[in-house]
Swiss-Prot record:
HAMAP family per record: Ribosomal_bL27 (MF_00539)
Keywords linked to the UniProt accession: Ribonucleoprotein, Ribosomal protein
Annotated stretches, region: Disordered: 1-24
Entry's family note: Belongs to the bacterial ribosomal protein bL27 family.
Protein name in UniProt: Large ribosomal subunit protein bL27
Gene: rpmA
Record GO cellular component, one term: cytosolic large ribosomal subunit
Species whose genome carries this gene: Magnetococcus marinus (strain ATCC BAA-1437 / JCM 17883 / MC-1)
Gene3D superfamilies in UniProt: 2.40.50.100
GO biological process: translation
Amino acid sequence: MAHKKAGGSSRNGRDSEGRRLGVKKYGGENVIPGNILVRQRGTKMWPGVGVGMGKDHTLFALEEGRVAFTMRRNRQYVNVEVAAAQ
C-alpha cells in the first residue's frame, strides 16, 4: 500500500497574463496622430477615415480630431472626424 498523498497540484496553478486589449480611446474623445484607438486580435473593428491599422491589427489615429464609431454592412468602423477650421 502506497503511503503518498495525492501530489498532482504542483503541476497546476499558472496562467498567462491578460493582453490589455480593447478600446483605448472612446467615441467623442479628442486624439492626435499616433494615438492608439483600439488594440485587438484580428479585425473586430476596421479602420475608417483618418485611421490606420498596424500589422497586429492595432487601430491608430492618422489625423487630429474626434473619435467616432460607425456600423456599415455588419462591420464596425473607427473614424477620426476632423474638426472644421475656424
